[in-house]
Amino acid sequence: MTLFGGVEAGGTKFVCIIASKPDDIRAETRFPTTTPAETLGRVIDFFQRNSRRYPISALGISCFGPVDLDTSSPTYGYITTTPKPGWAQTDILHRLSDALKTPAILDTDVNGAALGEYRWGAGQGADPCLYLTIGTGIGGGGIVNGKPIHGLVHPEMGHMRLPHDWQADPFPGWCPYHGDCFEGLA
């Protein structure tokens, strides 16, 4: 049976899994998101410790962002200008793929969740399928014609600017890039 590795790279925690399908989980772990070196080291350690018993044929990574998903970009696979301290310009895709010597693919955390709901959860039969999340951040992912939305049409919902009455509420927002976007005011 073919086994796959999965990484949910979240702003507060990482979850790693080895499975053949959603209801056949062979190994799983979770740990807090700290520094890139420590956190990615724990990811690599989990898969290497389990590689003899549960060898994976590929790795899927859903990651907080923003992430560069343009395969022609020199920073493809990187977490880019994230407000998460210490994580900006982290090459998560190649660091994990190279260390584990396995093919890997990366998408946004919300697209990963949207795809999971579309294939196995509440989004089955819905196309397009939209997934909204409020957690460490605010975001959304979308599936159209069975594929995640990328590029200029990707819905960075957490960073949409909101109408803001500066007289009633002078708070400028905490987002270092947009100030009073949805996430910056939450």
PLM features: residue spans?
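N-terminal beta1-alpha1 ligand-phosphate binding loop
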Residues: 4-19
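Short glycine-aspartate micro-motif
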Residues: 4-8, 56-60, 105, 129-133
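Glycine/GP-enriched mid-protein hinge/lid loop-to-helix segment characteristic of carbohydrate kinases
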Residues: 17-21, 27-30, 37, 105, ...
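Glycine-rich phosphate-binding loop and adjoining helix at the ATP-binding site
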Residues: 34, 40, 58, 65-128, ...
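N-terminal phosphate-binding loop and adjacent alpha-helix
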Residues: 22-55, 73
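Short glycine-rich anion-binding loops that position phosphate/pyrophosphate groups of nucleotides
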Residues: 12, 64-67, 135-137
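Hydrophobic "anchor" residues
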Residues: 13, 25, 74, 79, ...
